[in-house]
């Protein structure tokens, strides 16, 4: 074509554009063109008001969708966004001119009514996060609704206004769309009449393509269809865009030749079509998306009336093979990085509603259950509705297997060995059952205890028990006894801790004790026969626990000793170690209830204090300086048992302290200075810490009360001791209180009698048995038995007088007396040794000379003895002569001779006195060793 014609066409188009300035027409380009490029859409510039109003409209839609599924987490999020947006400065200025946005008021009204009308049953089904959001929005919603009470009043008076306005708007839009599509079809039909036989001279296919996918007429009030279809918009948009892009490419290629030549002469008519198409596109931007989704029905829509198609543009229904092919595609994407589990669940649920045939139904349902488990995580459990769906799904799988006896269940990586007529189906119902059980325990961990919600959730335990019984029967009939044994131990673990006797059990066993014993025996025998070593150990521990809570101490103790599990508990896995600890603690509590104090103390001694982690009732205590191990913390958190299975730590500590008191008090009275006999270290540490205090406060805690009881018991006041013990709070956790108190009273009386004899036996020569019986309120025969046993064990030195029914105590020295005597003997030996050393070093003559200076002292010590009177007089006369000699320095020979005679007599007197004292001490020591009578 010549350049002249092209210039003419451009001038013509410019003149047209000046007359119609609202529509911009793009020049047709050759070789690079597409149907979508030729449809020019107007870019609408929204005002600030329209933008804000549009945000509120979107929030209203999200709120509606969230409330349909009781998703209060999303509702709270949208509510917070709207309240922030409504208080924005720009929004406030617009509201002053235009008023409040209707969508905001509608959203407030919808949230308020939904929050108010939520039933109790619906509240029970909310999971933890959802329930938290439901409670948190209550106060915020009340404050906000009070601020906008005037605007909310019309909707309260007539709630139908919320839907009427939207239905009216939707119907108007549908009428406009219908009229526009009809006008476009009429125009396109007029253009088709003016075409040549093989070419489209005037009309453009892209203009008609934009309205090919018509939206069918909908009824008023059908606004929910848009929100439901939006859930699957992201998936179906890709499918639709591919089909549209392929169609547009084909059309652009086929029409590329038609854009030359004659098209340039008919540019005026062409512009009208383009202009009309652009206007239609601008007004139907959102509607076209929904129309295109309706043009090709997606299997994700989930609508019962929708007809699935085999291809993007084909109208054929999906066959069973095609459905299974799509199911495999969904399964292949499971677990990938950007895969949404919720969307996969929606897809599988839709395919499950379409599938036919038992085998295909089993496969789709099994994969659906596996996908539902993917919604849980390590810390977050399955929501209660999903958990119940999974339980129902497992029941349906089991029904399919029981109905079709020719179906053989095989594992995924197992080669099936089937005979003629049998059908192999892949699945592992045991794994599904174990995961369902674990999710149930995890769900209980996330609920506060004890609350009504916890009790309601705990009622679902019966679902697991019934399902486990059915699965065990199926595996037994299938010959898979190993899997049946694993299910049996799961059933045992839901039964062994229940007893109608336990007060701290939140749900006592509704089954009679005889039936419960029979069931435990039956399941245990099956596990012993077909289970492995680990399952057998767990079964034994569960039976020990079960016998202990039913006060069968001897059976539980014998089972523990015969199994030898206490020899190497560290070789077990962690969960089995926890079960072993629980069995030991419960065995100790049983021994305490039965009156076996020593056995009770031996069992619970290692579990007092902050050792909750040993019983899976809390996290382990770490030092403040230690680094936080998140991996270990997560592992311990997952191992924590549900709260209704816990053994109260206060009960364990109180039993340990009382047992320690009844053991340690008589031991301390018998051997007060021997630390090796202090076996109850936990009790002794507490007593020592209180004794070190300067001021002891009144008793408030259990430990303080037991301290006061110990002091009373040490003094032999058993009545005061019992008064303190009876005020403890642990009695509310003890079943059969009267029987336990009676046994404990008898034990306290016996211990008080022993302590009294150990402490005050040295103060009595003899005592009557009747007096002891009256003092401690014990039968005379029992007192006789206790005293005889103490004498037989050489704990007291006494003899029994049967004629007078009295006890005669033999004198025995106390520890203090023994130490004093030993000290005196050491002093005597020390003096004698010093004298021998003195004689060796200085000689006897020097010591005699030294004694002369001290003779007056030696003589003075025995002044008053008659047979030494003359010697004393001579010695005194010697002192006078010696003084005169020093004063006058004159001495006669006769007096000098008399002086030496008196000196020799004085030395002889000192030696005799020393020998007399030594003999007296030795004889006194001998008398004390033979018999020492102490009178206090």
Swiss-Prot record:
Boundaries of every PCI domain copy: 643-814
Family: Belongs to the eIF-3 subunit C family.
Record GO terms (molecular function): RNA binding; translation initiation factor activity; translation initiation factor binding
Organism name: Dictyostelium discoideum
One GO location term (cellular component): eukaryotic 43S preinitiation complex
Bias-annotated ranges (Low complexity): 9-22, 199-215, 880-893, 902-911
Name of protein: Eukaryotic translation initiation factor 3 subunit C
Location in the cell: Cytoplasm
Stored PANTHER family: EUKARYOTIC TRANSLATION INITATION FACTOR 3, SUBUNIT 8 EIF3S8 -RELATED (PTHR13937), EUKARYOTIC TRANSLATION INITIATION FACTOR 3 SUBUNIT C-RELATED (PTHR13937:SF0)
SUPFAM superfamilies: Winged helix' DNA-binding domain
Main location, first listed in the record: cytoplasm
Basic residues bias (residue ranges): 862-879, 912-928
Chain spans, region Disordered: 1-38, 156-265, 283-317, 845-936
SMART domains, alphabetized: PINT
InterPro entries to which the protein is assigned, alphabetical: EIF3C, EIF3C_N_dom, PCI_dom, WH_DNA-bd_sf
Biased composition (Basic and acidic residues): 283-294
Any one GO biological process: formation of cytoplasmic translation initiation complex
Comp. bias regions, Acidic residues: 172-190, 223-240, 247-260
